Amino acid sequence: MASVLEKVLRVGEGRVLRRLEAYAKAVSALEDDFSALADDELMHETVELRERYSKGESLDDLLPEAFAAVREASKRTLGMRHFDVQIMGGAALHLGNIAEMKTGEGKTLVATTAAYLNAITSRGVHVITVNDYLASYQSELMGRVFRALGMTTGVILAGQTPEERREQYAADITYGTNNEFGFDYLRDNMAWQASDMVQRGHYFAIVDEVDSILIDEARTPLIISGPSSGEANRWFNEFANLAKRLEPQVDYEVDEKKRTVGVLESGIEKVEDYLGIDNLYESANTPLISFLNNAIKANALFKRDKDYVVMNGEVLIVDEHTGRILVGRRYNEGIHQAIEAKEGVEVRAENQTLATVTLQNYFRLYKKLSGMTGTAETEAAEFMSTYKLGVVPIPTNKPMQRIDQDDLIYKNEKAKFDQVVEDIAKRHEKGQPVLVGTTSVEKSEYLSRLLAKKGVRHEVLNAKNHAREAAIVAQAGRLGSVTVATNMAGRGTDIMLGGNAEFIAVAEMNARGLSPVQTPEEYEAAWDQVFGVVKATVAGEAEEVIKAGGLYVLGTERHESRRIDNQLRGRSGRQGDPGESRFYLSLTDDLMRLFNAGAAESLMGRTSVPDDMAIESKVVSRAIRSAQSQVEARNAEIRKNVLKYDDVLNRQREAIYGDRRHILEGDDLHERVQTFLTEVVDDILDQHTGEGSGDDWDFDALWAELKTLYPVGVSIDEVIAEAGNKGRINRDFMRREILSDARIAYKSREESLGETAMRELERRVVLSVIDRRWRDHLYEMDYLKDGIGLRAMAQRDPLVEYQREGYAMFQQMMGAIREETIGFLFNLEVEVNQAPNGVESSAVAAKGLARGDSEARLSYSAPGERGEVEVRNQRGQIEQAATARAQQHSSAAVAAPEQGATQRGAFGQRVSAADDAAPANRAERRAQKKPTKRH
């Protein structure tokens, strides 16, 4: 049942749909005119539309003709005509909305209309997809439509060089993943030359599977990190061994629902005995606490082949939603290292954050944002509040014929899977294709073994064989096929009855060695014949599949999010095809077990239901909906909180990145450096001169500090002589004298190096200092954020405290940038390179001005589903380095309690005022009966 907020958000929906229908009619009215155009005339439409736009016509005015041109180009190149509902979807995208379109309604084709229209501005359009394969596939297929209209397409893929990326971004429409676009934004803001930058702005983005990218992946930021000093800590391995000796419920407690562990007294004793320390509560031992908690969590909460897999000596996280391996993605706060230690693989060194941005704030950079998905309605409120995006449900082209059966609930998992296998076998026997959704790699392999015993041929699609994902999904609608997949896997590739003709045709073209990029003319010439043959074969098989009942989707467990369940169901019944879906559940499923399945258990108990008999009950259905709502609300709150804190950092990031961009684009820094010089001198005078005259000042200390800044050319005696005596010197007089001397020294420095070299030195120094100080500031802000929650104990709002202290730290950083810049400009030993003809070159070299981080050593960390971090190197290969130095450091730090706050021990236990010293031994602690805190 829709909430009040959901109903409010739907007010005006009818008016929007009427506007979209009007656009669709206007486009259809032009169809015959555009069909009559020759190919070169159709291509010339782009030139005409661009001319009209440059003369002041709006994109809204040009929409009917632009959309009609795309529809015609698609008919000619792909043999696919945009339905009216697809035209409506494209208009919704152009107007800056999320178009909610059911699976199979052709969202990839929908994007072409809005992308083409907005590319008329020549400002670049970005189409964001969920993985590299889809980016490459869509740019290849839809690129044929755009080429027919005289537009270019590009694709951003992991491992491309900066030159390749720059070329792809220069295209009219560029496809790629959210991670690649975000990392390029961060890299551009670490560039040392304008020529190193690859992106050309953020004008219009179309986000495919928008709920997956903007909701599911929005909890953790994109991070570029580089090696920090220090080695991987031996404590991870020590505590991994120790955790295996601890017993659950005896030495520690586990709360699976909250994902927390609590260490009990006997556990603390064992830790102290193992480590040979007297008291874990002593401040010197507090860094060990995070290692202990992480080791226990790695053992108790993270299961191999469910939460992660171990391949080639590396721990790889499995996406809880899709079952895919999240390439290199990492858990934060030392959890990933703890799992590596638990599994006996190499524990990698941690990294330091160099640049970071959340997906929310990256996508807010776009002047206009839009998206497509089949399941956005449940998150409509969050889309509106975070991104100012409305959700517009687009009608289906044909009425939905899928039958969604009621859930069947069994007492235990074995009984459930036995019935699942029976159901699959019956469907398989009559030729009906079956898609089975499981929640983990472990479950998919378990079901696969049961099906093999039953003699049912099938394909398994999970994190361990994701390389064949698209091929498996494309064939999942064929007669008699059985596909066991982790939930939502294969998203973005249509399951068409009889097989995906498009996919099969592209594969055939590739097999013939034809490419739309390398051999575009041969590709176009062969396409129609290949596609025609494949299409005819598929159509015949599709008729048989329809007679068998269409695609049957069988879910083996409810997901914690309603959207994921709906996505699985949505694989069936595309484009008016017949289909069926059903979920099989058991009382031991994670969702039922963790979120109050008491109602279901009591119902089973009362009715004495045999193990192999299912029940259908509204009570159980309500319990499931309630559990899902709890999880969704919790996850939404996490994302909201992440955004609140990142908004503070985002304002600072915009200021720093704006400064860097102006510098790279050639702003003259001479005036700014002079301002820096004035402000630094003012700061020094503030420290050494108070109210009144010079009689009370320490001139020696003042001169000593000035000499660390620049070569002072005036002596104390000369200044006093100029004034007459110390008593006649005031701050304004001193300021004039010192600034005059400093400017003379700067002018002398410039004359010795040459004006051109000095301007280049200013640019290099300012960039170098900004980058170094910004990197340190990110570390400090991470540290501040991790400890700021403790302020709540002093009745203070952590967010307000974070804003206040973050601003103070930013001001400190800006002061340090000014002071360090002036110090470097005066004191660096600089070598000016001369050109062969003797003309002065602007190239300067100085120690400390080289780029601090080699591209090859950087790591690229992307957002995960539960705050984990994806880490890759420059070539796109998996890395296992820690996300940031601050995470480890802050987890080991203990914040001092605020004045008046309740004091806490190392494990968070209360310490009374009379007892604020740490207990001397275990007996003393037991006597005090101190409780432990959950972590």
Swiss-Prot record:
SMART domains, sorted: SecA_DEAD, SecA_PP_bind
Main location: membrane
Region (Disordered): 879-935
Any GO BP annotation: protein targeting
Keyword Protein transport: yes
GO CC annotation, single: cytosol
Transmembrane stretches, start-end: none
Taxonomic lineage of the native organism: Bacteria, Bacillati, Actinomycetota, Actinomycetes, Micrococcales
Key word Manganese present: no
Residues noted as binding ATP in the record, renumbered to the chain: Q86, G104, E105, G106, K107, T108, D494
Chemical reaction(s) catalysed: ATP + H2O + cellular proteinSide 1 = ADP + phosphate + cellular proteinSide 2
The protein's name: Protein translocase subunit SecA
Alphabetical UniProt keywords: ATP-binding, Cell membrane, Cytoplasm, Membrane, Nucleotide-binding, Protein transport, Translocase, Translocation, Transport
Entries under InterPro entries matching the protein: Helicase_ATP-bd, Helicase_C-like, P-loop_NTPase, SecA, SecA_CS, SecA_DEAD, SecA_motor_DEAD, SecA_preprotein_X-link_dom
Cellular localisation: Cell membrane; Cytoplasm
Any one GO MF annotation of this record: protein-exporting ATPase activity
Role according to the record: Part of the Sec protein translocase complex. Interacts with the SecYEG preprotein conducting channel. Has a central role in coupling the hydrolysis of ATP to the transfer of proteins into and across the cell membrane, serving as an ATP-driven molecular motor driving the stepwise translocation of polypeptide chains across the membrane.
Subunit details: Monomer and homodimer. Part of the essential Sec protein translocation apparatus which comprises SecA, SecYEG and auxiliary proteins SecDF. Other proteins may also be involved.
Membrane topology: Peripheral membrane protein
EC code(s) of this entry: 7.4.2.8
